[in-house]
Curated annotation (Swiss-Prot):
Co-factor binding details: Binds 1 Mg(2+) ion per subunit. Binds 1 thiamine pyrophosphate per subunit.
Metal-binding keyword on record: yes
Molecular-function GO term, any one: magnesium ion binding
SUPFAM superfamilies: Thiamin diphosphate-binding fold (THDP-binding), TK C-terminal domain-like
Gene source species: Clostridium novyi (strain NT)
Coiled-coil ranges per UniProt: none
GO CC annotations on file: cytosol
Descriptive protein name: 1-deoxy-D-xylulose-5-phosphate synthase
Keywords annotated in UniProt: Isoprene biosynthesis, Magnesium, Metal-binding, Thiamine biosynthesis, Thiamine pyrophosphate, Transferase
Essential cofactor(s): Mg(2+); thiamine diphosphate
Binding residues annotated for thiamine diphosphate, in chain numbering: H74, G115, H116, S117, G147, A148, N175, Y285, E365
Catalytic activity, as annotated: D-glyceraldehyde 3-phosphate + pyruvate + H(+) = 1-deoxy-D-xylulose 5-phosphate + CO2
């Protein structure tokens, strides 16, 4: 029975609830989340860990005037329930349904949209400074996890916060996890605070003595210096306070009464304050508590067993993971780098077999790329496995530190193209465009997961940067693997008719299906696998143009700056410079200049006319 949950009317009720009722409400919210996400899938473990914290925040703050920014945003399901969206969970992350992240168009209480990590403090600080310049009165809060705190942007923001003394509250949600287990110096530092409460007890007792003792100024100054020295011994660095940020904690992130008291204290302090809360990712569901990594983002699952309802087959991530282990056996110079995504990118097996050659840098893509550059300069063969959407964060480093020096770094780009339910902030539809204009960069796309190992071996033997991009999941049809590669040379799969469909990566399977459907309609098509996006195969394009082919390019990337534009530009140059007298026409198919929302992969390709039927319709238009 969910008496409080079922009768909940809005945020104003939280401020009137007793702590015992809030504790009951927390359990009812957990039951609701476990039940709903078991059917739809979603980010379960992170949301189960912030139930009490969210309730405490919304009991203290008035969201009609105060502002709260949630870092990453995948832990905002409780926020969505409390702000009136519980009835939309049946369509969570589905096309046309509720987003799994904050969306300003969904609610006035979604103050800032997030998806990538480490942005909340910067955004909240911007809001706080806007408040001050406009002479407004409100509280601004950033909620950030210990994983996100490993991101350089978060540290940059803290540095700015402490320097300018802006009134801002930062809640550190410390669950010792990002998606997987946290790594690095920041994580180690926080661990020392968690397990050693001596400083916090000392600070409270010391301040109490000073308040009760009548002493002179000189003695007080000496004692303050003594206090400073002792706290350095007890908690080395006192990282936050030395940056000029008042530190409160660590406190139990599942004790609503204690949370409320500390938040109220922070609310009444001048200058920036950081509240350090300790939470358990997956709390309240035994399977998520035992394996929070698996329940970070999970598909529909069985409530009683915790097992995923639909077991996926072979994936590109697994193919990459197997391939890099095999490659590392042959070449001791191979090293693997990830930015807090070991399991997601398929590197678990490598990390266990070659722990000294595996480097998880935390949520620090910029650092990861330049680390790889340094390794390459020193004779190693670094392979950086990263999701397409997160490689965006290291754009400058790829250009400045890798391509500019023409260093042999391999980028294994996972989750390229449409990833589905995570939505706009996670779709991998920009990488071809931002990599395509980088000098010295070679870009490859396997048409089948069996090609990953051959591409990876080829890439690792080059003396310049190579990016291999591949989609989430596996293959829709079985295609024979191309096993040998010559830079810039494509693969002709079908030679029929005077229409050439040139596809890259995952879209080759779509092209094959289109060819079969068009043939049944009496139209013959030549299908070409553009296994190299950069450089393009100029000899094939020149041949097609000289024979007046209608050329159609097909990619799972935005059209602007993408693969198709490279083909179009070269084909046009052949015609406009009078190199070839041709009536060829080039049509580019890909994603338009817009952000792609959440939904299933199949539905999103269909909605953008990049499924088989959509491509066929586009071909018919130019016949």
């Amino acid at each position: 029975m969910s008496e409080i949950f079922d009768n909940y009317k809005g945020l104003y009720e939280l401020r009137k609830m007793s702590f015992s009722d809030l504790d009951k409400f927390a359990q009812e919210i957990r039951n609701f989340l476990i039940n709903k996400i078991s059917k739809t899938g979603g980010h379960l473990a992170s949301n189960l860990g912030v139930v009490e914290l969210t309730l405490a925040l919304y009991k203290v703050f008035d969201l009609d005037k105060d502002k709260i920014v949630w870092d990453v945003g995948h832990q905002t399901y409780v926020h969505k329930i409390l702000t009136g969206r519980a009835d939309r969970f049946d369509n969570l992350r589905q096309f046309g349904g509720m987003s799994g992240f904050p969306k300003r168009c969904e609610s006035k209480y979604d103050f800032f949209e997030t998806g990538h990590s480490s942005t909340s403090i910067s955004a909240a600080l911007g809001m706080a400074r806007a408040r001050d310049l406009k002479n407004e009165k409100c509280n601004v809060v950033a909620v950030i996890g210990d994983g996100a705190l490993t991101g350089g942007m978060a540290i940059e923001a803290l540095n700015d916060v402490g320097d300018k003394k802006t009134n801002l509250i930062v809640i550190l949600n410390d669950n010792q996890m990002s998606i997987g287990k946290n790594v690095g110096g920041v994580s180690t530092y926080l661990s020392r605070i968690r397990i050693d409460p001596k400083y916090n007890k000392f600070k409270a007792d010391f301040n109490d003595v000073l308040r009760k003792t009548n002493i002179g100024t000189g003695v007080a100054d000496s004692l303050s210096k003594l206090k400073s020295g002792i706290k350095q011994m007890l908690v080395p660095g006192m990282f936050f306070e030395e940056m000029g940020i008042k530190y409160l904690g660590p406190i139990d992130g599942h004790n609503i009464k204690e949370l409320t008291e500390v938040i109220n204290t922070a609310k009444n302090l001048n200058g920036p304050v950081l509240i350090h809360t300790i939470t358990q990712k997956g709390k309240g569901y035994k399977f998520a508590e035992k394996d929070p990594n698996r329940f970070h983002g999970i598909g529909a699952f069985n409530l009683d067993t915790g097992k995923v309802s639909k077991i996926s087959g072979d994936t590109y991530s697994k193919a990459f993971g197997d391939a890099i282990v095999e490659l590392a056996e042959e070449d001791k110079r191979i090293v693997a780098i990830t930015a807090a995504m070991r399991d997601g990118t398929g590197l678990k097996k490598f990390s266990e077999k070659y722990p000294k050659r595996f480097f998880d840098v935390g949520i620090a893509e910029q650092h990861a790329v330049t680390l790889a550059a340094g390794m390459a300069q020193s004779g190693l063969k670094p392979i950086f496995a990263v999701y397409s959407t997160f490689l965006q964060r290291a754009y400058d480093q790829v250009i400045h530190d890798v391509c500019h020096q023409n260093l042999p770094v391999v980028f294994a780009i996972d989750r390229a193209g449409i990833v589905g339910s995570d939505g706009e902030t996670h779709q991998g539809v920009f990488d071809l465009s931002f990599l395509n204009h980088m000098p010295n960069m070679t870009i490859m796309c396997p048409k089948s997961l069996h090609e990953v190992k051959y591409m990876l071996k080829w890439a690792a033997n080059q003396n310049s940067p190579v990016a291999i991009r591949y989609p989430r999941g596996g293959d829709s049809i079985e295609l024979s693997a191309k096993t040998d590669y010559i830079v810039g040379k494509w693969e002709v799969l079908k030679t029929e008719g005077n229409i050439a469909l040139i596809a890259t990566g995952k879209m080759v399977a779509t092209a094959i299906k289109v060819q079969e459907k068009m043939k049944a309609m009496g139209v013959n098509i030549t299908v070409i696998n553009a296994c190299f996006v950069k450089p393009i195969d100029k000899s094939i394009i020149k041949k097609l143009v000289s024979k007046n082919y209608k050329i159609i390019t097909l990619e799972d990337n935005v059209l602007s700056g993408g693969f198709g534009e490279s083909v179009l530009q070269y084909a046009n140059s052949l015609i406009t410079t009078n190199s070839i007298n041709s009536e060829s026409k080039v049509v580019n198919l890909g994603f338009d200049d817009k952000f792609i929302p959440h939904g299933s992969v199949d539905i999103l390709y269909k909605a953008n006319n990049l499924d088989v039927d959509g491509v066929v319709k586009n071909i018919v238009k130019i016949l």
